[in-house]
Amino acid sequence: MKSRTDPPGDPINVYFREALLIGGEATRLYLVRHAQSQGNTGEDLASGDADLTEVGREQARRLGERLKTQKIDRVYASPLRRTQQTASAIADASGLDVIPKADLREVQLGQADYDIRLLPEKERQKVARLIMSEGTWDAFPGSEGSETARNRCRNVIKEIVNDHPGERLVVVAHAAFIQTFVSVVLGLQRDFIFYPFNASITSIRAKDGRFVLWRMNDIAHLDGMPAGFGGIS
């Protein structure tokens, strides 16, 4: 583990140092959603394992430059091509290797993994009602399910953090994975509470089994990319 010191900052921080994990001892976790893929643009909905688009490759390059400034120690990623390609750009910028982790995969949503529009109309209406009223992965027929997804997301992140205490760790995953884990950290019942943008960074600190959300859906590194081409519309 590298030795780091933090600037003293606001004196009020002394009151929240332990509660909010302020200081250099906590593990820094950077949850990154993969950059724009051909699945996101509709170019490849069939394979389930789409490559990045040209825009996505530029987003990934910018992620690498941004995270290099954080002096990251390790880069983990789900095994799918869109996450591996994003993670490779981040790792290359910092002279690191990508560590694949199967349990970082996307939440399995059954028919919705392909095209929920293929469901009968009554079934689609039922799914829509459950999404609004309950907001959990249980709304999707044939899905992995909320409890299973939450346990998987929680356990794999705990495993990664426990293996590298005090380090700065990048985890490249998927939108539903990030939504689920943030919901767990915040102690919420709903599984999806925000939309993680492509190539966004959600920062979490961890220590002694506790997790504190520090920053959510950060895309400052995408400034200047036009809406529809990697920027936010």
Regions found by a protein language model. Give the residues of each.
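Glycine-rich phosphate-binding loop signature in dinucleotide/nucleotide-binding domains
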Residues: 69-71, 160-167
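Loop-to-helix element that buttresses phosphate recognition and phosphoryl-transfer chemistry
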Residues: 29-31, 36-90, 142-154
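Phosphate-coordination/substrate-recognition cap region in phosphate-metabolizing enzymes
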Residues: 2-19, 23-24, 62-129, 211
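Domain-level recognition of soluble alpha/beta enzyme cores
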Residues: 188-212
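Short glycine-enriched, charge-decorated loop/helix-capping segments at active-site entrances
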Residues: 44-52, 115-117, 189-190, 230
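Acidic, His/Gly-rich catalytic cores of divalent-metal-dependent hydrolytic chemistry
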Residues: 214-233
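Generic beta-sheet signal
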Residues: 29, 167-175
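Short glycine/proline- and acidic residue-enriched helix-loop micro-motifs
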Residues: 126-148
